[in-house]
Structure formats: C-alpha cells, structure tokens
C-alpha cells in the first residue's frame, strides 16, 4: 500500500454524473463523525473526457466498489472554481477508518486496478503520488441537511502569526459559534458546517505542513455568499487575521456515492 508522505504545502501550492441512493449520498455529503479518514486524489482530464464519459466511469467505479464490498462511507468530486496547475478535479473518498482505507487500497491495486485503468483510459488519469488523507473533526453540523448531491467547499490553509497559537484559534471558534447561533436565530437555520482537518501525511523541510486546515461547506453558492456577507459585518474577519494568515481555495462539489 502506498505510504502517504506528501506535504500540505504541495497541496496548497497547486490548488488556486451519476449517484447512488439518497441515503448513501447523504453520508458522502454531510460529514458524519464516522468518517475517520477523508482522502483526496488528484485527477486530470483526458482527450476523451466529457460529461457523458465521466458519468460512465463513475457508474463503473461504483459498480466495482459494490462488487468488492469495501468499507467506504461515500465519495465526492471537487472541481476548482478557477483553473489550476496540477489537476482538473479531485476525487474524494470517505472512509470509516485507516484500516478500512488501507485494506481497500491493497485489494484494489492487486485485483481491480488493471480493469479500472482500462475503463478510464482516455477519459481521465491520476498519479498515486498525489493522494492526500486527513482525519476530520466536525466542529459544527449543518442545521438544515443538504437534500441535493451538490455543495460548495472551501479550504482555509492557515499558519499562526507570531506569538499566537491554538488557544487563540479555540477562542475564535467559540466566538464564531456564537456568531453562527445569532445568525440562525435572526435569519433561520441553514446548511453551513465546518470541519478541522488533520493531515495523515508528513511535511518536509522544504514543504512544511500548515498549522491548521479549516474546511467550510455550504449547500449552494447563494448560501455561501450570504454567509460571507454576514461574516463581513460581524468583525470576526479582523480577529481571524490578527492571529493567523490563511489562504482560501474554493471548489464546487458533487456527491457520487
């Protein structure tokens, strides 16, 4: 099984269909705490890529996963909102444990990968050097579950400013929770939720890990824009900028399993 040792900074630097039943899509979408591992695999489009050909390989992949009986909670596709260098989209897999992840990958590479490579030839490709796994901690669940297979996703790659640290982050999160409660009391519940992501791979001297990764998710673009408008009026942005420096990377997401 491939060892995950790639750096978060590499991930940051290069960043700028068909679905199954509603129950499994919900697991892929709403980030249940049972997802102990979230894995991101970079993909590039091939010469024969189209929405139709991609939908066919998604169906093929789901059939292969079902046939092998892997312990997997769901899967998503993330498409960057701006053109980036290094990949065209990211295939995300949600696992109940690292043991389940490793067992599935080991079996897949030995027994299934050849068939999969034939199925995706000309449509898309991936490099196993660009696989990144994280342990998620859900900090706030959505008040209104997303009933669609689409969502908006934003990573915040952050480093603490000098003389600041995790205690400052915790204090900010407490204020942020109060802000979300007040906003929902005024405007009604919404689909926003967020997750702290701990990398399950090592950084290097040339490419160290960020201090923390904050992942925000919304039901749609309108909800995201409304959330940002409220946030801008709250004064929290200035507080966040005081203790850390972050880079945002945004995607549109679609649950495929």
Can you describe what each PLM-predicted range is?
Residues 14-18:
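C-terminal motif of bacterial Sec signal peptides marking the signal peptidase cleavage site
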Residues 1-4:
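Positively charged n-region of N-terminal signal peptides that target proteins for export
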Residues 20-257:
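Short S/T/G/P-rich N-terminal loop/turn motif that feeds into the first structured element of a domain
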Residues 6-10:
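Sec-dependent N-terminal signal peptides
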